[in-house]
Regions:
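Flexible, gly/pro- and Lys/Arg-enriched active-site loops
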Residues: 2-165, 169-170
Length: 172
């Protein structure tokens, strides 16, 4: 699971990210490349097209939704099953849930690892990342390099208790 979150847990406003952090976009690409992605329909709409070199799975209740280059599932369980199959085929160990708020809320109990870009601002928004319970432990924190006028931010990897391993944050 991967997200960029403000201090007050905001991840989006009116279908958009409330910030522009090029280094975070590079981090997102490095962490998700070649891994199956699970996202809600609104998140897919905000991206606007399938992300290359990744299986894009869109979860929606809309039974008429279709889009070239994505696979559509109508519940999270079937999305996880499809992503699991693809992860085995690709030889990757992670499935990446990339949003939005409803999908994060539903998927968090199933997650064992989180990659969060924690942005040191409070912003108004309408989409939020769920609170983490005490079962999550910070494993690694790397300070970002904000450009002038950008807020400070850190790239943070969390593991659920009992799920820690030696996988470090990707370089670059």
């Amino acid at each position: 699971m991967i997200a960029a979150v403000s201090r007050n847990r905001v991840i989006g406003v009116e279908g958009k990210l409330p910030w522009y952090l090029p280094e975070d976009l590079k981090f997102f690409k490095a962490v998700t490349l070649h891994k199956p992605l699970i996202m809600g329909r609104a998140t897919f709409a905000s991206i606007g097209k399938p992300l290359p070199n990744r299986l894009n799975i869109v979860v929606t209740r809309d039974t008429t939704f279709e889009h070239p280059g994505v696979r559509v599932c109508h519940d999270l369980a079937s999305a996880f099953a499809l992503a699991d199959d693809q992860a085995m085929i690709e030889g990757v160990e992670e499935i990446m849930v990339i949003g939005g708020g409803e999908i994060y809320q539903q998927a968090l109990p199933c997650a064992s690892r989180l990659y969060l870009t924690e942005i040191d601002i409070e912003v108004d928004g309408d989409t939020f990342f769920p609170e983490l319970d005490a079962g999550w432990q910070e494993q690694e924190r790397v300070a970002g390099s904000p450009a002038e006028g950008q807020p400070d931010y850190d790239f943070v990897r969390y593991e659920r208790d009992g799920a820690a391993d030696s996988q470090a944050l990707p370089a670059g």
